[in-house]
């Protein structure tokens, strides 16, 4: 069980997961600089709470974003979604992010504060007006200490930006709240004789059940991708990554994922038309895999979590059905507590499959459904149910599998449709209750 120290919404990274999942180095896209500082939102007086990304390349970047479906959308969500729609994804060249305060359900003052964060950032960076998107995360219902933020933006923008690994890690740390480690991923891929780089960061440990939860993130690339293509790629990749994870079943007021492409690495422009279809497919595959890697880190850092669980549903009639079934299991509190207790109570899995809201009566046929625990160490799977018939389960073997930190659960619906989906979740523990019971104390 990990130890977490919380002062309102700041943390000390004391989990062993920090040493395992925080990269010691990375590769980063050309033409971007990032950084983070403490500006005075978090009350401990030192935790980083303001982050900034800037496009340094001489041309306007392409941008796309997806936002929370929660009806109580936070002020930064409302302002940023309106802005990116008005600009049609062209000329978004920076992102300003604060942590420690969500600026959600804060009325007209909250809207003004979000707009002022954009205004000051654009002014300091000498951007054209409305070239910045804003994100916030933290406690809901409190007004921002806006004077601290507005005075911190020049300090951050003029003195604390850079493109080193340390700058990227500082930026990732500055957006954390109850996270026990900053989430940062980078990679390179080849296309059309050019080497392109992806870098991304995310925050989130609780209130995670997206259709888009308190989940913030952005990833950037130096590949030349049009706004239209980037928007299509982002929606596809988020559906299979950030919208396929769950920690606690809550969807927050602030969820935002932003993608920016500045084209600094050169090469032919990638659009979503027939002439660049092959290149589009490559970029979509790379970004989707990248987004999945980043999203999985959020689950691994689930508040109080001790297990990382991949629920793989196969042979469904459709991808939608497969995902609905996987999501139903992933969000079952009874299933998640059984995983924490290392209890092979597969009846809870079947129960969640059975009440999932799939599209037709033929989507789930009990006599065709099979369930297995699959160890991630390569050893033999443990079959629990085959075509609706229960197996005699070796409880010692089941307990041994469930002691592992990582676990795959395979659900074969046996419909003949051949469609599959993955959904990533974690267990539900005593510590989750402790963290969230003390969140504002």
Curated annotation (Swiss-Prot):
<feature type="binding site">
    <location>
        <position position="203"/>
    </location>
    <ligand>
        <name>substrate</name>
    </ligand>
</feature>
<protein>
    <recommendedName>
        <fullName>Arginine biosynthesis bifunctional protein ArgJ, mitochondrial</fullName>
        <ecNumber>2.3.1.35</ecNumber>
        <ecNumber>2.3.1.1</ecNumber>
    </recommendedName>
</protein>
<keyword id="KW-0511">Multifunctional enzyme</keyword>
<feature type="binding site">
    <location>
        <position position="441"/>
    </location>
    <ligand>
        <name>substrate</name>
    </ligand>
</feature>
<feature type="binding site">
    <location>
        <position position="303"/>
    </location>
    <ligand>
        <name>substrate</name>
    </ligand>
</feature>
<feature type="binding site">
    <location>
        <position position="436"/>
    </location>
    <ligand>
        <name>substrate</name>
    </ligand>
</feature>
<dbReference type="GO" id="GO:0006592">
    <property type="term" value="P:ornithine biosynthetic process"/>
</dbReference>
<feature type="binding site">
    <location>
        <position position="214"/>
    </location>
    <ligand>
        <name>substrate</name>
    </ligand>
</feature>
<keyword id="KW-0068">Autocatalytic cleavage</keyword>
<keyword id="KW-0808">Transferase</keyword>
<dbReference type="Pfam" id="PF01960">
    <property type="entry name" value="ArgJ"/>
</dbReference>
<comment type="similarity">
    <text>Belongs to the ArgJ family.</text>
</comment>
<comment type="subunit">
    <text>Heterodimer of an alpha and a beta chain.</text>
</comment>
<comment type="function">
    <text>Catalyzes two activities which are involved in the cyclic version of arginine biosynthesis: the synthesis of acetylglutamate from glutamate and acetyl-CoA, and of ornithine by transacetylation between acetylornithine and glutamate.</text>
</comment>
<keyword id="KW-0055">Arginine biosynthesis</keyword>
<keyword id="KW-0496">Mitochondrion</keyword>
<dbReference type="GO" id="GO:0006526">
    <property type="term" value="P:L-arginine biosynthetic process"/>
</dbReference>
<feature type="site" description="Involved in the stabilization of negative charge on the oxyanion by the formation of the oxyanion hole">
    <location>
        <position position="138"/>
    </location>
</feature>
<dbReference type="InterPro" id="IPR042195">
    <property type="entry name" value="ArgJ_beta_C"/>
</dbReference>
<keyword id="KW-0028">Amino-acid biosynthesis</keyword>
<feature type="site" description="Involved in the stabilization of negative charge on the oxyanion by the formation of the oxyanion hole">
    <location>
        <position position="137"/>
    </location>
</feature>
<feature type="site" description="Cleavage; by autolysis">
    <location>
        <begin position="213"/>
        <end position="214"/>
    </location>
</feature>
<dbReference type="GO" id="GO:0004042">
    <property type="term" value="F:L-glutamate N-acetyltransferase activity"/>
</dbReference>
<comment type="pathway">
    <text>Amino-acid biosynthesis; L-arginine biosynthesis; L-ornithine and N-acetyl-L-glutamate from L-glutamate and N(2)-acetyl-L-ornithine (cyclic): step 1/1.</text>
</comment>
<keyword id="KW-0012">Acyltransferase</keyword>
<dbReference type="InterPro" id="IPR002813">
    <property type="entry name" value="Arg_biosynth_ArgJ"/>
</dbReference>
<dbReference type="GO" id="GO:0004358">
    <property type="term" value="F:glutamate N-acetyltransferase activity"/>
</dbReference>
<dbReference type="GO" id="GO:0005759">
    <property type="term" value="C:mitochondrial matrix"/>
</dbReference>
<dbReference type="InterPro" id="IPR016117">
    <property type="entry name" value="ArgJ-like_dom_sf"/>
</dbReference>
<feature type="active site" description="Nucleophile">
    <location>
        <position position="214"/>
    </location>
</feature>
<feature type="binding site">
    <location>
        <position position="177"/>
    </location>
    <ligand>
        <name>substrate</name>
    </ligand>
</feature>
<comment type="pathway">
    <text>Amino-acid biosynthesis; L-arginine biosynthesis; N(2)-acetyl-L-ornithine from L-glutamate: step 1/4.</text>
</comment>
């Amino acid at each position: 069980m990990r130890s977490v120290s919380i002062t309102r919404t700041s943390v000390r990274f004391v989990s062993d997961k920090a040493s395992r999942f925080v990269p010691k180095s990375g590769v980063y896209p050309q033409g971007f600089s990032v950084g983070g500082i403490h500006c005075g939102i978090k009350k401990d007086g030192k935790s980083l709470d303001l982050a900034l990304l800037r496009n340094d390349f001489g041309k306007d970047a392409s941008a796309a974003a997806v936002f929370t479906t929660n009806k109580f959308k936070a002020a930064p969500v409302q302002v940023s979604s309106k802005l990116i729609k008005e600009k049609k994804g062209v000329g978004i060249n920076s992102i300003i992010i604060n942590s420690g305060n969500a600026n959600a359900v804060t009325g007209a003052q909250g809207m003004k504060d979000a707009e002022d964060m954009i205004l000051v950032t654009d002014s300091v960076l000498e951007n054209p007006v409305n070239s910045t998107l804003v994100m916030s995360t933290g406690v809901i219902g409190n007004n921002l200490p806006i004077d601290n933020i507005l005075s911190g933006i020049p300090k951050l923008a003029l003195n604390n930006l850079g493109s080193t690994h340390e700058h990227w890690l500082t930026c990732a740390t500055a957006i954390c709240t109850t996270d026990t480690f900053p989430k940062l991923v980078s990679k390179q891929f080849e296309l059309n004789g050019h080497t392109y780089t992806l870098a991304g960061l995310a925050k989130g440990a609780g209130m995670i059940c997206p259709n888009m939860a308190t989940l913030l993130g952005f990833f950037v690339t130096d590949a030349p991708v049009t706004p239209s293509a980037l928007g299509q790629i982002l929606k596809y990749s988020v559906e299979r990554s950030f919208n396929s994870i769950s920690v606690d079943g809550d969807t927050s007021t602030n969820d935002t994922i932003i993608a920016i492409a500045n084209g600094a690495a050169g090469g032919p422009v990638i659009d979503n038309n027939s002439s660049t279809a092959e290149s589009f497919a490559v970029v979509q595959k790379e970004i989707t895999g990248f987004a999945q890697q980043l999203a999985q880190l959020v689950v691994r850092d689930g508040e109080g979590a001790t297990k990382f669980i991949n629920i793989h549903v196969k042979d469904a009639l459709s991808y939608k059905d497969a995902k609905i079934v996987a999501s139903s299991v992933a969000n079952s509190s009874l299933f998640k507590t059984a995983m924490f207790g290392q209890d092979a109570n597969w009846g809870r899995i079947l129960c969640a499959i059975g009440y999932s809201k799939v599209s037709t009566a033929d989507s789930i046929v009990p006599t065709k459904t099979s369930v297995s625990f699959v160890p991630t160490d390569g050893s033999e799977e443990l079959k629990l149910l085959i075509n609706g018939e229960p197996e005699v389960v070796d409880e010692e073997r089941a307990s041994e599998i469930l002691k592992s930190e990582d676990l795959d659960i395979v659900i074969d619906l046996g419909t003949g449709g051949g469609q599959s989906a993955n959904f990533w979740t974690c267990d539900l523990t005593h510590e989750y209750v402790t963290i969230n019971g003390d969140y504002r104390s």
